[in-house]
Amino acid sequence: MLLRRVVEGGWAVAAAARGSGAHRFSSPDCCQRLPGGGSFLQRHHPGAQAPDGRRKFGTDHVEVGSQAGADGTRPPKASLPSGGPSEPQYPLPPELQPPTNCCMSGCPNCVWVEYADRLLQHFQDGGERALAALEEHVADENLKAFLRMEIQLHTRCGG
């Protein structure tokens, strides 16, 4: 009984929203009836359909009979030229490796802030090599931006 009232209340809200000129369902959306008078909204995403019911991520689409993805036609990734120096420009000692234990909750004593401080103490050049090492050894662009700001603030304020 309570569920029926919730469903009916949902219809009243939807009808009121349509009457007020609010956002209407777009064409790929459709409402299907459930047994007992309820309904649910079903969205169709043409790019996400998989004919066999499974999605395959990280693989290229290859047509049957095509030579595009045949084994042996592409060189292995390890044999491709790297396009850059094989050794890092600013190698870090083991105690200065980027942290792996961040909880991502925005702590005031974040391990990444401590990492930026250790880089500044190690290089002691006003932050230039610390910023370069940061660019080279930290993969996440958001963390890089945060740490860049921390290093720049630390060098401006003098510690």
From Swiss-Prot:
Pfam families: Oxidored-like. Residues 52-63 have a biased composition (Basic and acidic residues). Residues 36-91 are annotated as: Disordered. GO terms for cellular component: mitochondrion. Residues 91-120 form the Oxidoreductase-like domain. Signal peptide: none annotated. It comes from the Eukaryota. Coiled coil: none annotated. This is Oxidoreductase-like domain-containing protein 1.
